[in-house]
UniProtKB/Swiss-Prot annotation:
The modification N6-(pyridoxal phosphate)lysine is found at K751. Belongs to the glycogen phosphorylase family. Its EC number is 2.4.1.1. It is found in: Cytoplasm, Cytosol. Keywords: Carbohydrate metabolism, Cytoplasm, Glycogen metabolism, Glycosyltransferase, Phosphoprotein, Pyridoxal phosphate, Transferase. Residues 1-21 are annotated as: Disordered. Activated by phosphorylation of Thr-31. This is Glycogen phosphorylase. Phosphorylase is an important allosteric enzyme in carbohydrate metabolism. Enzymes from different sources differ in their regulatory mechanisms and in their natural substrates. However, all known phosphorylases share catalytic and structural properties. One of its GO terms (biological process) is glycogen catabolic process. The gene is GPH1. Homodimer.
Length: 902
């Protein structure tokens, strides 16, 4: 099938009607209509046609009966099924399509409203959008009001749909379980982006998200013999009823080739022609994002890569069957998976290709929308704010400069002024080694014109630096976008993002201060501190309280006498919960909510474990549920957690060996379940070794009958948003124990606190602000401070000291092969990293403090339960600052300069 037209013409009429009773033939449009265009078309449409169109206009359903009509219609016509073969999956698809119909009606109105009012828009570029399940989110967020009974329907669409499905013979819970998590992200970066698009829709910010439509997600994680095994995530196998395929929106994207200068163009600063060697098409898929209690529906546009020519008939007819589809395979690999393994050259090139493909398609879509308004280019920054979520979309800076200079023929400096006023960059790391870099050779091969532009950007930038600091010669090499010191010259993408943006923000107060004094201190010296701001991360309470923990949301609503749950829009209302910390009846209900959530989690773990109950259900209320669920990485220190578990297990065994009764052991080490979840990058050997160790420890501990269920260890495979919604509400304690000064913010800590779980953590990332907001008495802090880290690392390197005896005994036990009898040296790299290779993440320095803090946790949870419950309530009461609505308000005011459109 030939590709659809990629024309972005503004011409509306392609053929005049031959009769006054006919509607003129109109072109398919890629964007909304301006008011003058609507008026022009309106005059050409016959009155009879307009009247019929209005009469049969699709309307939103607002009653259970109307939903049932729409549902059955989709079952029988869209899905071609019937009453007799409509299973839960078909019910999910039909329900999703019915809900989507409502959202699309509001989506069209929202987009037309934005086009008509022409406000400044926000474009949020993120390589990840970890959206979770869409149906339940839509049921909570969507606005339904029955005009005949607005009070009864207001704020209760989920209850209405639940009842409607019950009448049709389906359980809402079973229907919701049919939806796979969208494979569009991995960790906190993608979940932050998802929370932000939710809040932007809720706040009425005119915004679109731009990402990629990964066919196989990042990967599905299986645990086989304790090892992580990556398999494709076939999340699209049954289709995706939420997306709208836009075959008419196809943007050609070029790679490789060479640069030509037209006559008169003598330098790289003049308009040049990039003659590409390979071209693919970016095809748009739209995903409606509903706001909460509003008819605003924003858009998430995802790009899929397709070839310009899918099939080479000449090669096929000549018997070259393999190469006849080679172009298709090369193109489709671009959006096959998130983060291709870059441990080898082809994977590295594919990653860069993926990033440019996404940036180019997104930027050209943004430019098309702007050009429609016919404003001068100087007004572009007044109409467009582009937020770079990490360094992955930094190529958009270079692409905009290329388009303005090469295609729009603007002067270089005029174009650069527009670029730097348009972009803002969010940094997500304080670790120098985590900053993204690309080899110059690879970059020039794939994107030759962009390399020229980067050289020019750097040249002008370094000129300005030299003028300001003529005597500081070393500053030029430290601050240069091009790194010269490595074996191969590298492009430092974070530096490019800073130079090309008008604002740079960190994501927690500590993080924002650290980047100004460490990795970006030279830029602060040049630009001054005002360019660098802080916007502490947040999470959407609609997803992480209402959807994840409906029983807690209901208790809060009843306690605050807030039947329409307005507190989900104004989280400051939660502070009223503080009045109930001495109310025994309320605390009893609060504890029951937690117990019910534990039962829900135990059911999930049983299901994941082939129907075997790992956790003893008899003592759930007296069992501390201790969670660490996040990406597996050495700096997040899952190894510290598992070493602590081993220490606890060995101490219990020693007590029994020395004649203590199980009751005496239980008094010293009360009941506890340690739960892990998270994925390692496929090529990250040490992280995968940590996963293996956790599972080996679980095998030994969980099958040791001598400790009688006092300690259990669980690794939940393939951790995702849906599993997080079950795990997080069940937590008593969660672990946020990164080495101080390494975690930018973290958002899982906020999710646990919002669900009444206490946290144990280092003084790092958003833990600092959580402690400030909810009170130091309600957080278990331990470990060294960030200002001590470099000195400790230096001492490890040049003045090594003996390990604490507690940690030494743990490492010796691991070295003995007790957890890996078939391969006693299995965990040698992990042990050696601490014993002999500098212990970069300071496990040995924090271990004893960590153990002592866990003793406090045991004491409070088991011996002072009423105090524990009070801390839990106060945590939720004071968590309001961490709503992503507050984040979006701060971005809007301090970075984007945009206002809500209501």
């Amino acid at each position: 099938m030939p590709p659809a037209s990629t024309s972005t013409t503004n011409d509306m009429i392609t053929e005049e009607p031959t009769s006054p009773h006919q509607i003129p033939r109109l072109t398919r449009r890629l964007t909304g209509f301006l008011p003058q265009e609507i008026k022009s078309i309106d005059t050409m449409i016959p009155l009879k046609s307009r009247a019929l169109w209005n009469k049969h206009q699709v309307k939103k359903f607002n009653k259970a009966e109307d939903f049932q009509d729409r549902f059955i219609d989709h079952v029988e016509t869209t899905l071609a099924r019937s009453l007799y073969n409509c299973d839960d999956m078909a019910a999910y698809e039909a329900a999703s399509m019915s809900i989507r119909d409502n959202l699309v009606i509001d989506w069209n109105k929202t987009q037309q409203k934005f086009t008509t009012r022409d406000p400044k828009r926000v474009y949020y570029l993120s390589l990840e959008f970890l959206m979770g399940r869409a149906l339940d989110n839509a049921l909570i967020n969507m606005k339904i009001e029955d005009p005949e009974d607005p009070a009864a329907s207001k704020g209760k669409p989920r209850e209405m749909i639940k009842g409607a499905l019950d009448d049709l013979g389906f359980k809402l819970e079973d229907v919701l379980d049919q939806e796979p998590d969208a494979g569009l992200g991995n960790g906190g970066l993608g979940r932050l982006a998802a929370c932000f698009v939710d809040s932007m829709a809720t706040e009425g910010i005119p915004a679109w998200g731009y990402g990629l439509r990964y066919e196989y997600g990042i990967f599905a994680q299986k645990i086989i013999d304790g090892y992580q095994v990556e398999t494709p995530d076939y999340w699209l196998n049954s289709g995706n009823p939420w997306e709208i395929e836009r075959n008419e929106v196809q943007i050609p994207v070029t790679f490789y080739g060479y640069v030509d200068r037209p006559e008169g163009g003598k330098t790289t600063l003049s308009a040049s022609q990039w003659i590409g060697g390979e071209r693919v098409l970016a095809v748009a898929y739209d995903f409606p994002v509903p706001g909460f209690k509003t008819s605003n529906v924003n858009n998430l546009r995802l790009w899929q890569a397709r070839p310009t020519t899918e099939f080479d008939f000449a090669k096929f007819n000549n018997g070259d069957y393999k190469n006849s589809v080679a172009q298709q395979q090369r193109a489709e690999s671009i959006t096959a998976v998130l983060y291709p393994n870059d441990n080898f050259a082809q994977g590295k090139e594919l990653r860069l290709k993926q990033q440019y493909f996404w940036c180019a398609a997104s930027l050209h879509d943004i430019l098309r929308r702007f050009k429609k308004s016919k404003r001068p280019w100087t007004e572009f920054p007044d109409q467009v704010a582009i937020q770079l979520n990490d360094t992955h979309p930094t190529l958009a800076i270079v692409e905009l400069q290329r388009v303005l200079v090469d295609l729009e023929k603007l002067d270089w400096h005029e174009a650069w002024d527009i670029v730097t006023k348009t972009f803002a960059y969010t940094n997500h790391t304080v670790m120098q080694e985590a900053l993204e870099k690309w080899p110059v050779g690879l970059f020039g091969h794939l994107l030759p014109r962009h390399l020229e532009i980067i050289y020019d950007i750097n040249w002008f930038f370094l000129q300005d630096v030299a003028k300001k600091f003529p005597k500081d010669v070393d500053l030029l090499s430290r601050i240069s976008i091009i790194e010269e010191n490595s074996p191969e010259r590298q492009i430092r993408m974070a530096f490019l993002a800073i130079v090309g943006s008008h604002k740079v923000n960190g994501v927690a107060e500590l993080h924002s201060e650290l980047i100004k004094t460490t990795i970006f201190k030279d830029f602060v010296k040049f630009y001054g501190p005002s360019k660098f701001v802080n916007v502490t991360n947040g999470i959407t309470p609609r997803r992480w309280l209402k959807q994840a923990n409906p029983s807690l949301a209901k208790l809060i609503s009843e306690t605050l006498n807030d039947p329409t749950e307005e507190y989900l829009l104004d989280m400051a209302k939660l502070t009223q919960l503080g009045k109930y910390v001495e109310d025994k009846e309320f605390l009893k209900k609060w504890n029951q909510v937690k117990l019910n959530n534990k039962i829900r989690l135990v059911d999930l773990i049983k299901k994941e474990n082939d129907g075997v109950d790992i956790i003893n259900r008899e003592y759930l209320d007296d069992t501390l549920f201790d969670m660490q669920v996040k990406r597996i990485h050495e700096y997040k220190r899952q190894q510290l957690n598992v070493f602590g578990i081993i220490y606890r297990y060995l101490a219990m065994k020693n007590m029994l060996k020395n004649g203590a009764s199980i009751e005496e052991v239980a008094k010293k080490y009360p009941r506890k379940v340690s739960i892990f979840g998270g994925k390692s990058a496929p090529g990250y050997y040490m992280a995968k070794l940590i996963i293996k160790l956790i599972n080996c420890v679980a095998d030994i501990v969980n099958n040791d009958e001598s400790i009688e269920h006092l300690l259990k260890v669980v690794f939940v495979a393939d951790y995702n948003v849906s599993k997080a919604e079950i795990i997080i509400p069940a937590s008593d304690l969660s672990e946020h124990i990164s080495t101080a000064g390494t975690e930018a913010s973290g958002t899982s800590n906020m999710k646990f606190v919002m669900n009444g779980g206490l946290i144990i953590g280092t003084v790092d990332g958003a833990n600092v602000e959580i402690t400030r907001e909810i009170g130091e008495d309600n957080v278990f802090l331990f470990g060294n401070l960030s200002e001590n880290v470099e000195e400790l690392r230096y001492n490890h390197q040049y003045h090594p000291q003996d390990l604490p005896s507690s940690l030494d005994s743990v490492l010796s036990y691991i070295e003995s092969g007790q957890f890996s009898p078939e391969n006693p040296n299995e965990f040698k790299p992990l042990v050696d990293s601490i014993k002999y290779h500098g212990d970069y993440y300071l496990v040995s320095d924090d271990f004893e403090s960590y153990l002592a803090t866990h003793e406090l946790v045991d004491q409070e949870f088991h011996n002072q339960r009423s105090e524990w419950l009070k801390k839990s309530v106060l945590s939720v009461a004071n968590v309001g600052f961490f709503s992503s609505d507050r984040c979006i308000e701060e971005y809007s005011d301090t970075i984007w300069n945009v206002e809500p459109v209501t």
